[in-house]
From Swiss-Prot:
Keywords, comma-separated and alphabetical: Exonuclease, Hydrolase, Magnesium, Metal-binding, Nuclease, tRNA processing
GO cellular component, one term: cytosol
Co-factor binding comment: Binds two Mg(2+) per subunit. The active form of the enzyme binds two Mg(2+) ions in its active site. The first Mg(2+) forms only one salt bridge with the protein.
Protein name: Ribonuclease T
InterPro entries per record: Exonuclease_RNaseT/DNA_pol3 (IPR013520), RNase_T (IPR005987), RNaseH-like_sf (IPR012337), RNaseH_sf (IPR036397)
Length: 221
């Protein structure tokens, strides 16, 4: 098939030309400019020819704390991450983010999208850490939209009446292990399953494509 006759990927028609990519970060605190980024996972999403959203491959990087980074002990206790454990095989922020961003840029092109949009559970947290790290690492080609995100905490509150990831997953019929939680890969994959489930359920219910709606005219005074 020639490029002229090639049909655009269905994903490019679903989210205004954006490719949703699910991201979870594990950190040494809550301040993206001061506290260390320790782990990042990105889960790719795709859409089949029938328009159903599916989870794809997962990319994970362990990250070395940047020079001068703050490490809150309470955050380390919560995640169970030892930043100095050599078995982590951690890499500097620039190398780790480059390894995460590269397949995302490739997927954006393959899905005929114009850029990626970050999906996360409480997405602002992940978005802020990704962008702060990219700025420190002087990475110019950040594939993510600079401010738009899809937040599964908000979507789950609408769909299931619960904003906690573990509880929302259980209500959605997605198995969730508290023992495996707080690993970037595990949390990102569960968030991806939750996001796909909500988007697909909305489609099943007839919410997308949106039905024609007659726009009422403003009353004339």
């Amino acid at each position: 098939m020639s490029d002229e006759n090639k049909q655009p990927h269905p994903m490019s028609q679903r989210f205004r030309g954006f490719l949703p990519v699910v991201v979870d970060v594990e950190t040494a605190g809550f301040n993206p400019e001061r506290d260390a980024l320790l782990e990042i996972a990105a889960v790719m999403l795709t859409m089949d020819e029938d328009g159903w959203l599916r989870r794809g491959e997962t990319h994970v990087q362990q990250i070395d704390p940047f020079e001068g980074a703050n490490l809150e002990q309470s955050a380390l206790d919560f995640t169970g991450i030892d930043p100095w454990n050599p078995e982590r095989e951690a890499v500097p922020e620039r190398e780790g983010l480059s390894e995460i961003f590269s397949p995302i840029r490739k997927a954006v092109k393959e899905h005929d999208c114009k850029r990626a949009v970050l999906v996360g559970h409480n997405a602002t947290f992940d978005h802020n850490f990704v962008f702060a790290a990219a700025l420190r690492a002087d990475i110019k080609r950040n594939p993510f939209h600079p401010f738009s995100t899809f937040d599964t905490a908000t979507l789950a509150g609408l769909a299931y009446g619960h904003t906690v990831l573990a509880q929302a997953c259980k209500l959605a019929g997605i198995p969730f292990s508290n023992k495996e939680a707080h690993s970037a890969a595990y949390d990102a994959e569960k968030t991806a399953d939750l996001f796909c489930g909500i988007v697909n359920r909305w489609r099943e219910l007839g919410g997308f494509p949106p039905p024609p709606i007659e726009i009422a005219e403003e009353p004339q005074e």
